[in-house]
Amino acid sequence: TDSTATAVADGSGVMTITSDGFTCKELTSAAGNVSTGSMCCWQWHCDAGDRITFNESGANPGGIRQTNATAGISIIRYTGTGSNGTIAHGLGKAPEFLIFKRGNATNIWAVWNVALGDDLKLVLNSADAQDADGAFMNSTLPTSTNITVGGASTNTNADGGDYLCYAFSSIQGYSKFGSYVGNGSGTSDGT
């Protein structure tokens, strides 16, 4: 996630997917199982839910979605339309955390959290502060059924863009999303 590069098929790191994770090939570069490097891996188990294919309809993108509402996660792959549109997420409640990445062009990892409101976003692969970007979700908060993607944003809905969106809602025992203000004392109240 420290790159804005396009997605590439690279079989140099992961060797096998297993029932409880994966194994890596032995490598001498930062692409996989290197004994002297730091690695980060994010995994979400989503196959216990529904897999839905949806068609482009007007300004609304088409694609495929795997949703596990019990765990509060929906993984959505879609093709952008270049116009303000909506995508059904299948969670049954409004997502509180979204990550978007365009795979067929150099682009940021655009991130939204419920604490940001409808006009701000963060960049996952950056130390930058939040920035105002109403085009990102067309200044529209997610609802219990849909995520809005802005047509003026290459981060979420450029015409022909190949996108991946991770949508999360807080589910007790699985996850919690919100914010906190640090106070320098080692304890803080989160919301």
Residue ranges and their predicted role:
Residues 1-191:
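Surface-exposed molecular-recognition determinants
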